């Protein structure tokens, strides 16, 4: 019943929860039914949860994004690195296909995953590629830092914390977590410290590689509930990592020397091939990387074997750095122009200034990562003074502002002339 008379007063009741109009804030009438604000809010929560669930599983059950579509989205945010984008796009596409294959009927052919290793100099876009993937993917995605990892039992994070983050990302839904993608940054920092086995335990190097082996290949990880610490007589969440795709990235400083030592061994005698050590840049050298070079660098052979796809990123030249400054959707120049527009001021960075920024980043060997610090230093004083200045219409940054630290040019708005009375 939705209506009831009490002491001459006609009381209305919610048709769903039965509460009276006095027990709720609002009662909305329909054809012979009523619904209260509390039931409406509950319905909205149910619909939101269902929509969120369908979005999370769209990559598995819906239309698969093709490698071309994935690559086109990466192009909007990351300049260059065409080969690395292709490798990532194909790997992610195949990951979606594997999940769909597993969710369907069982087949005699078992599809195994192809984990990826990204090799490239600092500031070449490894982390940005991973962050951009995180925005466009419909499967859980987490990033981890290899430098914080140690063997279990030592101070620091153990490798199972990575899976714990994956669980947290999808609100401890184990099925979703088992279909996720993990990006481990700075993987080169856990290389073995020496070619020869040491009598002291290498808890943050080879020890971490050994711990990651089974996790990357596929194992049942025991995760404490709600991020607690492990202790006896505790129920653990069991997560199978067999279908979790792992992408590892690192700068691998010094790997180029290992590759050159292998490829440029000089022969002796008349039949020896003469090779020049000059004219090869870092990009060309990294393209010649072989598993044996990674082992020589300090990764254990078993770990290298579990990363079958190796993608190398190019060293960014001056033109590429300028493109990064102005072309992507979230380009650095666009970000600063937005900040200045909030003060009602236009910001113009002249082409010569852009070239100066790029040259400075190359000189510092910081790649694209160093662009922000250079621009921030050049614009710091004007950003400090601008809120106190009246009538500034435009700020112009030229080459001298970047190279010599001179102040940018300020253009003031013309003041309207007031005609004097005779």
Curated annotation (Swiss-Prot):
SMART domains given for it? Answer: AAA (SM00382), ClpB_D2-small (SM01086), zf-C4_ClpX (SM00994)
Q: Which residues are involved in binding ATP?
A: 121-128
Q: Which InterPro entries does the record cross-reference, listed alphabetically? A: AAA+_ATPase, ATP-dep_Clp_protease_ClpX, ATPase_AAA_core, Clp_ATPase_C, Clp_protease_ATP-bd_su_ClpX, ClpX_bact, P-loop_NTPase, Znf_CppX_C4
Q: Which domain of life is it from?
A: Bacteria
One GO biological process term is: proteolysis involved in protein catabolic process
A Pfam family assignment: AAA_2
Question: Entry's SUPFAM superfamilies?
Answer: Glucocorticoid receptor-like (DNA-binding domain) (SSF57716), P-loop containing nucleoside triphosphate hydrolases (SSF52540)
Question: Which CDD domains does the entry mention?
Answer: RecA-like_ClpX (cd19497)
Q: Which PROSITE patterns match?
A: CLPX_ZB
Looking at the record, the residues that make up the ClpX-type ZB domain are 1-55
Q: Which UniProt keywords apply?
A: ATP-binding, Chaperone, Metal-binding, Nucleotide-binding, Zinc
Q: Where does Zn(2+) bind?
A: 14, 17, 36, 39
Carries keyword Nucleotide-binding?
yes
Entry keyword annotation includes Nucleus: no
Which protein family is named in the record? Answer: Belongs to the ClpX chaperone family.
The job of this chain, per UniProt, is described as: ATP-dependent specificity component of the Clp protease. It directs the protease to specific substrates. Can perform chaperone functions in the absence of ClpP.
Q: Tell me what this protein is called.
A: ATP-dependent Clp protease ATP-binding subunit ClpX
Q: Which organism is it from?
A: Azoarcus sp. (strain BH72)
Give the gene that encodes this protein. clpX
